[in-house]
Amino acid sequence: MHKRTYLNACLVLALAAGASQASAAPGASEMAGDVAVLQASPASTGHARFANPNAATSAAGIHFAAPPARRVARAAPLAPKPGTPLQVGVGLKTATPEIDLATLEWIDTPDGRHTARFPISAAGAASLRAAIRLETRSGSLPDDVLLHFAGAGKEIFEASGKDLSLNRPYWSPVIEGDTLTVELVLPANLQPGDLRLSVPQVSYFADSLYKAGYRDGFGASGSCEVDAVCATQSGTRAYDNATAAVAKMVFTSSADGGSYICTGTLLNNGNSPKRQLFWSAAHCIEDQATAATLQTIWFYNTTQCYGDASTINQSVTVLTGGANILHRDAKRDTLLLELKRTPPAGVFYQGWSATPIANGSLGHDIHHPRGDAKKYSQGNVSAVGVTYDGHTALTRVDWPSAVVEGGSSGSGLLTVAGDGSYQLRGGLYGGPSYCGAPTSQRNDYFSDFSGVYSQISRYFAP
């Protein structure tokens, strides 16, 4: 994972800003896309620093045994049921979750803060994240308490006391490797004996989420899938903007520690500063506890058509911090989140239309099938307002070639506006399609953005 240079970021911003300014003024039921102006904080994108860079990691920590291989295989079926997220991690619990802070090696920084490091490991894990409970004996945790997280990669993520809740565990970012190193930083007026720390469970990934520079899932999708960069529209400003609005989602269930993948889209809005509105599927995020664990992966695509893993975009960026649920309708499978952290520079706020989609429309989908690098599918809307698998007000899309798969859930159904820009019209629920499917099964179903817009319109304007 590499940081964009200042000049490259400015170039992206300038080009996209020009596209935004050329867009028609949005009406009451639609809005053109726009470029991101604010930049993500280093702490939320893996560019934090240890408070005590040269400190050793304490021997005291928590170790989890590897899960049975059969359990790992059973958790990640090749063809998950429609309307279910793709599982990529399994939960492991321990009967002894407490860590005695007095046993850690504490070192003070020059400004008087107290620091210590400890490991959380799981045998054989390719990637790992941990549920952490940290609280003072009086209850509330000061905002200036810091936690730093690192794995085998170069990334160091940061959380503060205000990110941790007394009501539920805080799930760390996903790190590479089988050992998560945690640095705990306490303000000068807080002593280790004032705190209680426990790690009740971890989420265990058998395959690396970040292997060799974000090659996770690379090539794992079906043979009929098309790299986003291979689309005939690739290289046009409108299409490239649309791809920059799409992110891979990784989230964890606090109930069992299982981790899952979906796809989501950043949506434009008229607020100043912009709100980080993020569209996906209700079946991906079931409750606020799960939304709080969300991390999004941006710019995960190849830079060459049908390129190998070496062509993965070097600007891939992970954003941590979770999200809040603004709207969720399980029956319609609609979901609107608000990311708690600002996405990285270079992302795009996708335009949208709340006008009902017309039967016969040409639909486009940019998604992450099986967690693979970004793919593109194009199809025809063959039915609107239909019921499928117990869900209502869905839009059916027929695929002539490339389809969608597990991990694509929540990805946006896009249409092209009169000015050539893309507009979001719904999100993927699922269906019977797969590479090699007969014509009768080469179709999938999307939620309808227009059907719930009256419920969510207040979030898109001041």
Swiss-Prot record:
GO annotation, biological process: proteolysis
Active site per database record: H283 (charge relay system), D333 (charge relay system), S409 (charge relay system)
SS bond list: C224-C435, C230-C305, C262-C284
Gene3D superfamilies with a match to the protein in the record: Trypsin-like serine proteases
Location(s) in or outside the cell: Secreted
Protein name, as recorded: Lysyl endopeptidase
Keywords: Autocatalytic cleavage, Disulfide bond, Hydrolase, Phosphoprotein, Protease, Secreted, Serine protease, Signal, Virulence, Zymogen
InterPro entries tied to this protein: Peptidase_S1_PA, Peptidase_S1_PA_chymotrypsin
Family membership: Belongs to the peptidase S1 family.
